[in-house]
UniProtKB/Swiss-Prot annotation:
MF terms in GO: leucyl-tRNA--protein transferase activity
Catalyses which reaction(s): N-terminal L-lysyl-[protein] + L-leucyl-tRNA(Leu) = N-terminal L-leucyl-L-lysyl-[protein] + tRNA(Leu) + H(+); N-terminal L-arginyl-[protein] + L-leucyl-tRNA(Leu) = N-terminal L-leucyl-L-arginyl-[protein] + tRNA(Leu) + H(+); L-phenylalanyl-tRNA(Phe) + an N-terminal L-alpha-aminoacyl-[protein] = an N-terminal L-phenylalanyl-L-alpha-aminoacyl-[protein] + tRNA(Phe)
Protein task: Functions in the N-end rule pathway of protein degradation where it conjugates Leu, Phe and, less efficiently, Met from aminoacyl-tRNAs to the N-termini of proteins containing an N-terminal arginine or lysine.
Keywords per UniProt: Acyltransferase, Cytoplasm, Transferase
UniProt-recorded name of the protein: Leucyl/phenylalanyl-tRNA--protein transferase
UniProt-annotated location(s): Cytoplasm
Taxonomic source organism: Oleidesulfovibrio alaskensis (strain ATCC BAA-1058 / DSM 17464 / G20)
Enzyme Commission number(s) of this protein: 2.3.2.6
Top-level class of the enzyme under EC nomenclature: transferase
InterPro entries named among the record's database cross-references: Acyl_CoA_acyltransferase (IPR016181), Leu/Phe-tRNA_Trfase (IPR004616), Leu/Phe-tRNA_Trfase_C (IPR042203), Leu/Phe-tRNA_Trfase_N (IPR042221)
Length: 248
């Protein structure tokens, strides 16, 4: 296959020309403008310290439609227990560093290298990268970061990047809060990028690249919810009378 080498121009090749593994292009930079252009075209960076910047558009693509989120009964009980507090965009840097430090089965290092951390911090400052923080009580009256996730939001799409947990179910709690908030705000799709058993259990599914790009085109017509996110007053992720009974 021919691997497209990016130039200084903010342009990418057609995602449909990616390799069977999803690899599309090499090089370029991680500027805010290039990253936004990439995500708007269904492309994301993924590499490590031993390689140049690599750009991917896998086929199939793992996505989660917010209305199809499945919350197991045990996780519902965990959320209702009140042992966790959830916030948005209050500790983005701590979340991305925790994701970088998290041990991954079958991986000896991390793809969230320093260059990536700096780039997504810039995206966060630009108001398009967001974090979900899950806190548990620490010693005394303090609290500790128990889990969380971060990703990029454009139009009606949230592109999930990474998550971590230090307490049982903390990352799962972050997923539920995020997806229910996205549904509340009218988002169309969560891009999970790579297929994982973890996300399939939440109701994610695989779709073809072509299907994803069509969905992306529609979703990006929605207005951008830029800036720091906040949880609406009174919002509760499980208090949705219109949702089907997920205990069945």
């Amino acid at each position: 296959m021919h691997l497209y080498a990016l130039s200084e121009k903010l342009e990418f090749p057609d995602p449909q020309t990616a390799s069977s593994e999803g690899l599309l292009a090499i090089g370029g930079d991680l500027s805010v403008a290039r990253l936004v252009t990439a995500y708007a075209n269904g492309i994301f960076p993924w590499y490590d310290d031993d390689t140049p910047i690599l750009w991917w558009s896998p086929d199939p693509r793992c996505v989660l439609y917010p209305s199809q989120l499945h919350v197991p009964a045990s996780l519902r009980r965990r959320i209702n227990s009140g042992q966790f507090e959830v916030t948005l965009d209050t500790a983005f840097e701590a979340v991305i560093h925790a994701c970088a430090d998290a041990a991954r089965p079958g991986q000896s290092g991390t793809w969230i290298v320093d260059e990536m951390i700096d780039a997504y911090m810039n995206l966060h400052e630009a108001g398009v990268a967001h974090s979900v923080e899950v806190w548990s009580r620490g010693a005394g009256d303090g609290r500790v970061l128990a889990g969380g996730l971060y990703g990029v939001a454009l139009g009606g799409v949230f592109y999930g990047e990474s998550m971590f947990y230090r307490r049982t179910d903390a990352s799962k709690v972050a997923v539920v809060w995020l997806v229910r908030l996205l549904e509340f705000w009218g988002y169309r799709v969560v891009d999970c990028q790579q297929t994982t058993t973890h996300m399939l259990r939440f109701g994610a599914q695989e779709v073809s690249r072509a299907c994803f790009l069509e969905e992306l085109d529609r979703a990006l017509r929605m207005p951008l919810r830029a800036g720091r996110w906040q949880i609406p007053d009174g919002f509760r992720p499980l208090r949705r009378a219109t949702l089907p009974d997920e205990n069945q």
